[in-house]
Amino acid sequence: RVILLMMVDTPEEKRKFVILYENYRYLMLKVAVDILRDYQLAEDAVQEAFVQVAKHMENVGQPEETATKRYLITITKHAAIDIYRRRNRLQSREIYMDELPEGKEQVTYMAPE
């Protein structure tokens, strides 16, 4: 949280960020866990969401506003989906590499002249 606060400019925005963090962190974590089914990855998603919040504090409404809550849930969903996609791409690459034959063929690469 301290590192994220360094991304926020004014003292007023810092106070608002702390309130957002304290009030919505667990809700955001629940949203991310529901998508990712992995607590550690969900924490990463919430962290990424708060990075976006810190970068765009001027666009974030007051903590008690329903629109602010919806905004935080939306960016958390997007962060979790991004992590889900990255994880699936990585897993599919690992599967592909595992399926390759273990030959000792020599591969020669010829650079274009």
Regions found by a protein language model. Give the residues of each.
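Sigma70-family region 2
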Residues: 9-10, 50-67, 86-88
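Arg/Lys-rich amphipathic alpha helix in sigma70-family domain 2
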Residues: 74-95
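Amphipathic, non-transmembrane alpha-helical scaffold segments
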Residues: 21-25, 73, 113
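Internal acidic/polar
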Residues: 90-113
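Conserved catalytic core of Hanks-type protein kinase domains
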Residues: 23, 35, 52, 74-75, ...
